[in-house]
Regions:
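Solvent-exposed loop segments of extracellular immunoglobulin-like
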Residues: 38-49
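Extracellular/luminal immunoglobulin-like beta-sandwich modules
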Residues: 1-10, 87-114
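Solvent-exposed loop/turn motifs of extracellular immunoglobulin-like beta-sandwich domains
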Residues: 1, 25-29, 41-43, 74-89
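Short beta-strand segments of immunoglobulin-like
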Residues: 18-25
Length: 114
């Protein structure tokens, strides 16, 4: 009798995290990183959303397909405007708990010294 082996492969929509960051106003490069964890681990990234601390959408930004958002270069005296919530949207083709293929996670950026 030949033994039978079963291989199971589970799929899971990603859970997404974005770390909070504090930057000094004179830092020229300001980046945020989207970290999805799911199976399969091949992700599509969508536009980032920048929201005020009150949840109002300020702008949408392209972050590329590596999950890293580099904030646009602006004059030092205007960098305080980069403070707020940043929402990453990504997916791996698997439908999540609430029926969505795209999942979101967010973190906050604070710009000090202006």
């Amino acid at each position: 009798m030949t033994p039978t082996f079963w291989t199971f492969s589970f799929t899971d929509a990603p859970s997404i995290s974005v770390s909070d960051f504090t930057y000094e106003h004179n830092e020229a490069t300001r980046t945020l990183t989207c970290v999805p964890v799911g199976n399969p681990s091949r992700y599509t990234y969508y536009k980032w959303q920048h929201k005020s601390t009150h949840g109002v959408l300020i702008r949408e930004l392209d972050g590329g397909q590596n999950g890293v958002l580099t904030l646009p270069s602006i004059p030092v005296e205007d960098r305080y405007q980069d403070s707020g919530e940043y929402v990453c949207t990504a997916g791996n083709g698997i439908v999540g708990r609430y029926g969505n293929v795209k999942q979101t996670g967010s973190g906050y950026a604070i710009i000090n010294g202006v």
